[in-house]
């Protein structure tokens, strides 16, 4: 089986930075999973003794705490400063951008609109920086009936599709007197999506490697399905099904921003061993 790897794929700058920080603080505790990839979280635990704690209240006093790439709510950060021995901030710089924007714009009287998943830890963190209650939506439809103010500021979860973000922006521009639009979608996310979009039009089957709880990985699957019906999301090579590749000649492979290279290499090697 011939395999084509997307030009842009895998670990982004923010994830690489976070992994290095975790590896250099052996025995540290991350507040929530550092990244959305179970296999890499297991590796950090086994090789570096880095464990995960979901709640600030359950952290042992005097701990060395690593803040996840997605950031944490403002209140949790305040609690950490009181209880942790040391705080290692692995929040992706692209995530701190919408946090700061929400803080500043809400203080200036703008109503904050966040395009993203309200249940995602990144969005929950960003929400906490707004001094007034923000509106969080996944589509323009969710804004129908919302009490929009004359002045609004729009930001996006960093891993969303630009087309969907622009749809929300267009809705607001047509209904509000003043709209401040901040494109907070990460450059690496955009590049990975574009590479996946192009590759999925050139192959018979697409494999997307990444955590099934990863927002950016699910976006890659959505994009690939637009152009290649035989697109599959897997966490590692063990989830590959040889029957998927029957009568296929070329397979495209991409990976989410939290997918380590060692998983990608195993996936590619396994697929190369299949007969179409």
From Swiss-Prot:
It is an enzyme of class 1 (oxidoreductase). One of its GO terms (biological process) is terpenoid biosynthetic process. Its EC number is 1.17.7.4. It catalyses: isopentenyl diphosphate + 2 oxidized [2Fe-2S]-[ferredoxin] + H2O = (2E)-4-hydroxy-3-methylbut-2-enyl diphosphate + 2 reduced [2Fe-2S]-[ferredoxin] + 2 H(+); dimethylallyl diphosphate + 2 oxidized [2Fe-2S]-[ferredoxin] + H2O = (2E)-4-hydroxy-3-methylbut-2-enyl diphosphate + 2 reduced [2Fe-2S]-[ferredoxin] + 2 H(+). The active site is at residue 122. NCBIfam families: ispH_lytB (TIGR00216), PRK01045.1-1 (NF002187). Catalyzes the conversion of 1-hydroxy-2-methyl-2-(E)-butenyl 4-diphosphate (HMBPP) into a mixture of isopentenyl diphosphate (IPP) and dimethylallyl diphosphate (DMAPP). Acts in the terminal step of the DOXP/MEP pathway for isoprenoid precursor biosynthesis. Belongs to the IspH family. This is 4-hydroxy-3-methylbut-2-enyl diphosphate reductase. It comes from Wolinella succinogenes (strain ATCC 29543 / DSM 1740 / CCUG 13145 / JCM 31913 / LMG 7466 / NCTC 11488 / FDC 602W).
């Amino acid at each position: 089986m011939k395999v084509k790897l997307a030009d842009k794929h895998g670990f982004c700058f923010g994830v690489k930075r976070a992994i290095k920080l975790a590896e250099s603080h052996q025995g540290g505790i991350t507040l929530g999973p550092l990244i959305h990839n179970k296999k890499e979280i297991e590796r950090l635990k086994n090789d570096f003794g880095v464990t995960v704690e979901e709640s600030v209240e359950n952290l042992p006093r005097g701990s060395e705490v690593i803040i996840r790439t997605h950031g944490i709510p403002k209140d949790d950060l305040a609690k950490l400063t009181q209880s942790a021995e040391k705080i290692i901030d692995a929040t992706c710089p692209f995530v701190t951008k919408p946090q700061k924007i929400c803080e500043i714009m809400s203080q200036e009287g703008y109503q904050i609109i966040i395009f993203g998943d309200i249940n995602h830890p990144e969005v929950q963190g960003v929400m906490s920086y707004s001094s007034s209650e923000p509106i969080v939506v996944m589509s323009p439809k969710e804004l129908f009936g919302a009490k929009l103010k004359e002045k609004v500021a729009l930001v996006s979860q960093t891993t969303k599709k630009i087309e969907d973000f622009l749809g929300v922006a267009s809705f607001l521009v047509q209904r509000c007197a003043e709209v401040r639009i901040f494109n907070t979608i990460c450059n690496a996310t955009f590049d990975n999506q574009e590479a996946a979009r192009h590759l999925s039009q050139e192959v018979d089957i697409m494999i997307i490697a990444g955590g099934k709880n990863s927002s950016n990985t699910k976006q890659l699957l959505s994009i690939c399905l637009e152009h290649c019906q035989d697109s599959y999301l897997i966490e590692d090579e063990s989830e590959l099904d040889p029957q998927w590749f029957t009568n296929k000649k070329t397979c495209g492979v991409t990976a989410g921003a939290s997918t380590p290279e060692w998983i990608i290499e195993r996936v590619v090697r396994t697929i190369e061993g299949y007969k179409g």
